[in-house]
Amino acid sequence: MKEITQLLEEFWIVKDKNTTDYYRIKRSIDNQMKNFLTDFVGWKLFVTNKLIKLEKLPAEAHPFMGIQRFESVNEYMLLCALLIYLDEKMDGTHFLLSELIENIEKIIAGYADIDLTRFTDRRSLIKVLKFAVEMSMLKISDGSIEAAEQDQSKEVLYENTGLSKFFSVNHDSSISEYTDYHDFENRSSLYTDDETDMVRTNRVYRRLLLQPSMYWDSDDDMDSIYLINQRQYIYKHLDKYVGGRLDIHTGAAFYMISEDNVFGKIHPSEKSISGFIALMCGKIREDIATINNSK
């Protein structure tokens, strides 16, 4: 149970970085867990000699699902260019920052107005490189990225770990004609009737697992119909592998993770801001009650 919640919480489990969890999770993976993740949720589970990754594709795109430290589209484009560059490198290959910059500029030319001699664009690249190091896609063999951020003449020697090939999603069909994220959400038109039923099942499980809530505004909503009709079966699966409580109300459903399996950012936390927020909410509720009673 805790193994799946950790796979939900973390992008991937890298063996060199977290050896204990890597082997613990690897030992826990059985055919039943694989069937739940692939057949019902529709996610791919990668287990290699370097990492374990649950490819958590959402049913719907939401702002909180992005890379939180990234602040512009250009930073995502620089990350994509970095992934393209690393894809052509053998595992363990070393390269200099100047070589990387030269190749990224070639890759990105014609797609965006990015000049890596400009302070803002170079700062964006440094942010992307720091992210790649934290994600274990790159290792710094020599030099300092902070020094290179302040002085463009400074070099950094990087090593390609080979993990970048598992970072992006491998889609089952071409996405070359897609123009925005809605195209990924509306792929159901590509499937047969039987496949559409499977896609609906996957979508409901994904919404419950990755979103704080699942809403609908029509009695004809197919996802809600499936959820209500199959609620006992869905709850049984989620309780077995994740642990929690499925609450269904008029127009909304919530999957509440049990206290023992809570992951991610939670409220209230031990920080003082949590106590302040609780006090403010209590005061607001008192004021609302006073206003209502005075009517």
Regions found by a protein language model. Name each.
Residues 1-68, 129, 144-265:
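Eukaryotic partner-binding/assembly regions in large regulatory complexes
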Residues 9, 73-94, 274-294:
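Positively charged, polyanion-binding regions of nucleic-acid-associated proteins
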Residues 15-27, 102-123, 134, 217-224, ...:
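Short helix-coil junctions and helix-kink-helix linkers
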Residues 46-60, 74-80, 101-106:
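A short glycine/small-residue-enriched secondary-structure motif
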Residues 53, 67-75, 115-119, 123, ...:
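Intrinsic, low-complexity N-terminal interaction/targeting segments
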Residues 64-75, 266-273:
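Extended Gly/Ser/Thr-rich low-complexity repeat segments
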Residues 84-162:
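Internal, well-ordered domain-core segments that constitute the primary functional module
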Residues 259, 267-269, 292:
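A charged, low-hydrophobicity C-terminal interaction/regulatory region common to genome-maintenance complexes
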